[in-house]
From Swiss-Prot:
It comes from the Bacteria. Removes maltotriose and maltotetraose chains that are attached by 1,6-alpha-linkage to the limit dextrin main chain, generating a debranched limit dextrin. It comes from Shigella flexneri serotype 5b (strain 8401). The gene is glgX. PANTHER family: GLYCOGEN DEBRANCHING ENZYME. It catalyses: Hydrolysis of (1->6)-alpha-D-glucosidic linkages to branches with degrees of polymerization of three or four glucose residues in limit dextrin. The record marks D443 as: Transition state stabilizer. Keywords: Carbohydrate metabolism, Glycogen metabolism, Glycosidase, Hydrolase. Gene3D superfamilies: Glycosidases (3.20.20.80), Golgi alpha-mannosidase II (2.60.40.1180), Immunoglobulins (2.60.40.10). The lineage of its organism: Bacteria, Pseudomonadati, Pseudomonadota, Gammaproteobacteria, Enterobacterales. This is Glycogen debranching enzyme. It holds the Pfam family GlgX_C. Pathway: Glycan degradation; glycogen degradation. HAMAP family: GlgX (MF_01248).
């Protein structure tokens, strides 16, 4: 091969122009950067990057072609106390690589050293980057752009969603292709889903600790190459990108948006005892928040924290997000531990990354959802994100569970959460849709487990049941575990129905965990991040068709209620909502705070949710008018006109007049 030309400092990464490849890499503290390319026999050829524009190192390799494997060796000081951990004996992944060849195994050679550098060369076993060329025909693809007020989110794992689906061809189950299969798309449409939110699909690695226990990181919240698709979800790693885009194109044609769960808060390099894959060896001091002693600020619980206030790291994160939108046509992002995005190190609404997103004509137009906390001091930031963001509403999750399963929440607190938690989100011009309401999510109990287990059962995770939250607000209804008498099963079913109704008929944006609509259980494991098995894979052969139909009917009912889809805050006397007691009268102040758990919620003057969350059957006097129960609480043609509803214990019903 010929020597490198100077090349250009932008864009970041490796880019083929038809004649060769331009390579760029950011490092503010490097003294020298070597591009290492590998031929078909694995022979390494090294080239110094000749260009240095500010903190960007760059070079152009004529005649290089797509498929070329490469990596970097970055030279600089080994000064751990200062936060510098350069080690040119270690081959490093390009942070902007579009494809990775090789596996991130637990191997001592993939560690740089803790206090002293490890100068053993690791090129023979280190994963390599691959130069790719992008030619994809999107045809007439267009984003659905579903209004927030009409959005129904379905949180799912690429593999777990389809791996056991009997109607999807065996050879594509658990893959990107399966997401776009007609069987899957028809199911989502019939259920009423408008947005498929996928757990991380950017390439991730399993922590060495898990590998030593024979486990793996199933969820994917351990990123190593943020521009590359995780190859294990592809039928062929070489075609992963096109398989993913084919699925997105098919989902878009069905009117379904795709939202990616993305991890910009930490990397798979973990703490100082963790592996050296990329950022630590490229510019540790710039990419991470570093303490005065040279160690990491661990505001994520994962060993390190990305410094998203550093200009170069902001550019990196912004470029990553734009890549997924522009190259893959995704419709939005859910940001894991998103408080890190606003750290300066204090949390600020005008933090550099927030400002960059707001000013970007691409990113400011997609759906943005924050998990609004991290584990740093003042890490809980629910309600404090910039107006462009919606946020996971854990207030709603806990309130719904406490009201229906612990019976210890006053009516006033329940109503506040039902009304999109306006005390939290009604500020800075935000709309009710800013509250992403959920009862369950990938972390925590499934909905079925909420009514079957009082305690977590995480022994399979190998941490002696210490991991996972103890604050589950669950209720096993008298027996720990699945199964039981008919009476027990029916009481659990009623609780599931109550929780689903609360979720899907509340103001705000509902998010449904995949599998909750057909009774999926993780057998009490509330932190199944490392379980690549039947605990996480949805067993469609055991799905409860009745529960699925109930859920679908609720979603379709929601779409008929103007007070829920118009995405306007409810105001006194606007006709959107009236709160009534069991006698169809406005609740008194005392009833709101101390009254029995009986409530009628009149929406849009036509739809009535009658609630009896007490231990006894109770007569509920409905407001004036001819009321009849509607699906999923009655048949399609229900001639019964009801004046008084005999509300069963812990029951609810929806009527229309």
């Amino acid at each position: 091969m010929t020597q490198l030309a100077i090349g250009k400092p932008a864009p970041l990464g490796a880019h083929y122009d038809g004649q060769g490849v331009n390579f760029t890499l950011f490092s503010a503290h490097a003294e020298r950067v070597e591009l290492c390319v590998f031929d078909a026999n694995g022979q390494e050829h090294r080239y110094d990057l000749p260009g240095n524009s500010g903190d960007i190192w760059h070079g152009y390799l004529p005649d290089a072609r797509p498929g070329l494997r490469y990596g970097y060796r970055v030279h600089g000081p080994w000064q751990p106390a200062e936060g510098h951990r350069f080690n040119p004996a270690k081959l490093l992944i390009d942070p902007c690589a579009r494809q990775i060849d090789g596996e991130f195994k637990d191997n001592p050679l993939l560690h740089a050293g803790h206090n002293e550098p490890d100068y053993r060369d690791n090129a023979a076993i280190a994963p390599k980057c691959v130069v790719v060329v992008d030619h994809y025909d999107w045809e007439d693809d267009a984003p659905p752009r579903t209004p927030w007020g009409s959005t129904i989110i379905y949180e799912a794992h690429v593999k777990g969603l389809t791996y056991l689906h009997p109607e999807i061809p065996v050879e594509i189950r658990g893959t990107y292709k399966a997401l776009g299969h007609p069987v899957m798309i028809n199911y989502l449409k019939q259920l009423g889903i408008t947005a498929l939110e996928l757990l991380p699909v950017a390439q991730f690695a399993s922590e060495p600790r898990l590998q030593r226990m024979g486990l793996s990181n199933y969820w994917g919240y351990n990123p190593v190459a943020m521009f590359a698709l995780h190859p294990a979800y592809a039928c062929s790693p070489e075609t992963a990108l096109d398989e993913f885009r084919d699925a997105i194109k098919a989902l878009h044609k069905a009117g379904i948006e795709v939202i990616l769960d993305i991890v910009l808060n930490h990397s798979a390099e973990l703490d100082l005892d963790g592996p050296l894959f990329s950022l630590r060896g490229i510019d540790n001091r710039s990419y991470y928040w570093i303490r005065e002693d040279g160690d990491y600020h661990n505001w994520t619980g994962c060993g390190n924290t990305l410094n998203l206030s550093h200009p170069a790291v902001v550019d990196y994160a912004s470029a990553c997000l734009r890549y997924w939108v522009e190259t893959c046509h995704v419709d939005g992002f859910r940001f894991d531990l998103a408080a890190v995005m606003g750290r300066t190190p204090e949390f600020r609404q005008d933090a550099p990354l927030f400002t960059a997103i707001q000013n970007c004509p691409v990113l400011s137009q997609v759906k943005l959802i924050a998990e609004p906390w991290d584990i740093a001091p003042s890490g809980y930031q629910v309600g404090n994100f910039p107006p462009l963001f919606a946020e996971w509403n854990d207030h709603f999750r806990d309130a719904a569970r406490r009201f229906w399963l612990h019976y210890d929440l006053p009516l006033g607190a329940f109503a506040g959460r039902f009304a999109a938690s306006s005390d939290v989100f009604k500020r800075n011009g935000r709309l009710p849709s800013a509250a992403i309401n959920l009862v369950t999510a990938h972390d925590g109990f499934t909905l079925r487990d909420c009514v079957c287990f009082n305690h977590k059962h995480n022994e399979a995770n190998g941490e002696e049941n210490r991991d996972g939250t103890n604050n589950n607000y669950s209720n096993n209804h008298g027996k720990e575990g699945l199964g039981g008498t008919l009476d027990l099963v029916e009481r659990r079913r009623d609780s599931i129905h109550a929780l689903l109704t609360t979720l899907l008929l509340s103001q705000g944006t509902p998010m449904l965990l995949a599998g909750d609509e057909h009774g999926h259980s993780q057998h009490g494991n509330n932190n199944a991040y490392c379980q690549d098995n039947q605990l996480n894979w949805l067993d469609w052969s055991q799905a409860s068709s009745g529960l699925t139909a109930f859920t679908a009917a609720l979603i379709h009912l929601r779409k008929r209620i103007p007070a829920l889809v118009e995405n306007r805050w409810w105001e006194e006397g606007d006709g959107n909502v009236r709160w009534l007691n069991r006698y169809a009268q406005p609740l008194s102040t005392d009833e709101w705070q101390n009254g029995p758990k009986q409530l009628q919620i009149l929406l849009s003057d036509r739809f009535l949710i009658a609630i009896n969350a007490t231990l006894e059957v109770t007569e509920i006097v409905l407001p004036a008018g001819e009321w009849h129960a509607i699906p999923p609480f009655a048949g399609e043609d229900n001639p019964v006109i009801t004046v008084v509803w005999q509300g069963p214990a812990h029951g609810l019903c929806v009527f229309q007049r």
